[in-house]
């Protein structure tokens, strides 16, 4: 008996955010793909030199190392991301880990400062 596309969509719709996140990770591993959005190169070609001189406006905040004060880092990670305790703990143990994607420069620097204050090593890219 084959499962219809509608049944698959209904099942996915019933998943919690955590379960859906785990499912996405499984898809990425099984099929060797990434769920991160890709940038269209055609727009940059049309802009020419003007596009190259523009300052980057979106940044990713990456936890490179959680340091010695893991509990404090977990608390800050939970505050920043809204993750649950287990997910925040996993994020601090599996470094490097992207905590926030596509944030503005000011927010990225604020997050970096908060994490560095509790002993974490953070990269902003």
Curated annotation (Swiss-Prot):
User: By which gene is this protein encoded?
Assistant: rplL
Q: Which family does it belong to?
A: Belongs to the bacterial ribosomal protein bL12 family.
Q: Which Pfam families match?
A: Ribosomal_L12 (PF00542), Ribosomal_L12_N (PF16320)
Name the record gives this protein: Large ribosomal subunit protein bL12
BP GO terms, sorted: translation
Specify the superkingdom.
Bacteria
Keyword Oxidoreductase applies: no
Role: Forms part of the ribosomal stalk which helps the ribosome interact with GTP-bound translation factors. Is thus essential for accurate translation.
